[in-house]
Amino acid sequence: MAKWLDNAIFYEIYPQSFLDTNGDGIGDFQGIIERLDYIKKLGCNAIWMNPCFASPFGDAGYDVADYYQAAPRYGTNADLKRLFHEVHKRDMHILLDLVPGHTSVAHPWFKESCKADRNEFTDRYIWTQDWQQDPDDPGPKATLAEMENVMRFWIGMGCDGFRVDMAGSLVKNDEDGKGNIALWRKVRTFLDAEFPEAVLVSEWGEPDKSLQGGFHMDFLLHFGPSHYNDLFRCEEPFFSGRGKGDVAAFVEKYKENYEKAQRKGLICIPSGNHDMDRLARSIHGEELKVAFAFLLSMPGAPFLYYGDGIGMRYVEKLHSVEGGYGRTGSRSPMQWDHTTNAGFSAAPKEKLYVKQDESADRPTVEAQMADPDSLYHEIQKLINIRQAHSALQSRGEIEFVYAEEKQYPLAYLRSDDKEKILVIINPADREVSFDGNYAVREALYTFGGEAVFTGGKVTVPGGSAGFYLL
């Protein structure tokens, strides 16, 4: 496994919404290049960029029309290669978003596959509901070989690997996952032979399967059995200050996945992504700081969705754009400063491909960087602490010491062969306590007040988070 994943912290870029440098109302590769220093200063050292290939953009670029060509609205292949170079100049890494399970109807493969006369593309797509080919039949094998060619092309140009869209769905009617696992094992064998440092991250949501398939990491997501939504995106999120949430089911499922994942790969807990409501739609203000203390102290590589680091909001009541439907409000343009269109674009407001948050109090990078008490600075502080302590990084062990049903706080130990750190997270706006004897050497980080350790009991202030070196 690539060594750089040990301390990787990812920043997800939705390219059309990040920064527009040519005034067409759509973000571009040059815009990403111009903001790499911001990403690095925040503390992130890796990037996942959403699809950037040629597309009619009926589904935000997930409808690929040419896997070998950058979307002209973002730039050229040469521009993308330059982006890879600029990322690497800063000792960072970048993953592209690979969409292997479907294409746009505009893709030449699909147009050929539609023809009545059989040809080399006839079996590249599934055309019937009543039967399907075996993954080892010539048609599916040719498709897999072509996906390997796509990977070979972009890794050769300089990308460091791929986040794979809907990775667990390529083999249909595969209830136990064995068909998909076998398919991805073949891809892993190919990569290990030609590009052993290339990283694969899956959108699967079942680490017990994806990591068997050779992925380095899998996300816990808003779908699937992880109880991820219990944390931030349900009627009573655990990270709401109301303190009516429940983290127990999430922890039980996490422990189950963690045991299965040991020595095979990593489990990632993202702040959000382009398919979810913004984090700030359900939790707010200081609650966000406590949430990031959790996200940045768990095993696996953290993923920060663009804008989450300044508390960007879900923009309500937007018309669907590029197939976003209810997700469109989470894809609004990045808010950089106080200038026109919050610094995203010099285009007239009505020319932006999707509307922005037009609130007078919308958060911006400029304002948050100027405010020492901002969410931006809290995240920066948390990342610095994580990078200074290997026990808090991707491969440090975790042991949950308090995660009771409908109770607060959440407490867990992070450890490696160098140190042991107790993490206590209390989003509830009330003081709580739990039993435990801990000899604390140093409070590495506190927000909202410091826990008190006396008489075999730990008393935790409301709305607080703390990392304690034992």
Name each model feature, range by range:
Residues 2-148, 156, 167-210, 214, ...:
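Acidic/aromatic-lined carbohydrate-recognition and catalytic surfaces
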Residues 16-18, 54-55, 100-101, 160, ...:
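Short, solvent-exposed loop/turn segments at secondary-structure junctions
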Residues 35, 79, 83, 143-154, ...:
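Alpha-helical packing segments of well-folded alpha/beta enzyme cores
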Residues 46, 91-93, 151, 160-163, ...:
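Beta-sheet entry/capping signal
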Residues 454-470:
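C-terminal beta-strand-rich structural cap/linker in extracellular carbohydrate-active enzymes
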